[in-house]
Amino acid sequence: MILTGKEIQKRIGKDIIITPYSEKQLNPNSYNLRLHEELLIYTELPLDMKKPNLTKKQIIPESGLLLKPGILYLGRTLEFTETHHLVPMLEGRSSIGRLGMLVHVTAGFGDVGFKGFWTLEISVIQPLIVYPGVEVCQIFYHTLEGQITEYTSGKYQANQGIQPSMLYQDFEK
């Protein structure tokens, strides 16, 4: 089952931590998260799964930044989230999708116990000017049945910013 907005609000500070939190971003069954001003762009193509891939930092100015099709932009949420006893999931807002912007490729599913900023895998299907602080996605929460084992040791746990792919670490095992 998915938590209602009222239930999300009731669990803030307990099972759900969102920092900063604003009641204005609460929806009937989700909470809107905003785009941070920093993006990362991979600088060498093709990308290689077996090694770290280089990136460059791009800041989105207040006046906006033109995103172009065919480029993967890694962004992050402005909000830090932490979730216990629930499964957090992320989805793009419909208003963003209607402009041709995708906020994740496949990583909209979080683990129980995840804490950190959400890295967004941003792409656009037509040129689009984006702005820092815009509400680009929404987080919602599923309840669980059965014994819970929280996510604690993953590559992306307790991150402090945008996380490029660390898939190469899987090859080192």
Swiss-Prot record:
- Which SUPFAM superfamilies does its entry note? dUTPase-like
A single Gene Ontology biological process assigned to it is: nucleobase-containing small molecule interconversion
Entry's Pfam families?
DCD
UniProt superkingdom: Bacteria
Which InterPro entries does this UniProt record tie to the protein? dCTP_deaminase (IPR011962), dUTPase-like_sf (IPR036157), dUTPase_trimeric (IPR033704)
Where do the annotations place dCTP binding? R93, S94, S95, I96, G97, R98, D111, T119, L120, E121, Q138
> What pathway is it annotated to?
Pyrimidine metabolism; dUMP biosynthesis; dUMP from dCTP: step 1/1
Q: What is its EC number?
A: 3.5.4.30
Query: What keywords would UniProt list here?
Result: Hydrolase, Nucleotide metabolism, Nucleotide-binding
Q: Which Gene3D superfamilies does its entry note?
A: 2.70.40.10
> In this UniProt entry, which residues are annotated as the site Important for bifunctional activity?
G108, F109
One MF term from GO for this chain?
A: dCTP deaminase (dUMP-forming) activity
Question: Which catalytic reaction applies to this protein?
Answer: dCTP + 2 H2O = dUMP + NH4(+) + diphosphate
Q: Does the keyword Nucleotide-binding apply?
A: yes
- Family under the similarity heading: Belongs to the dCTP deaminase family.
Q: What does this protein do?
A: Bifunctional enzyme that catalyzes both the deamination of dCTP to dUTP and the hydrolysis of dUTP to dUMP without releasing the toxic dUTP intermediate.
Quote the PANTHER family the UniProt record gives. Answer: DCTP DEAMINASE (PTHR42680:SF3)
What subunit structure does UniProt give? Answer: Homotrimer.
| The protein's name in its UniProt record | dCTP deaminase, dUMP-forming
Q: Which organism is it from?
A: Leptospira borgpetersenii serovar Hardjo-bovis (strain JB197)
Its gene is dcd
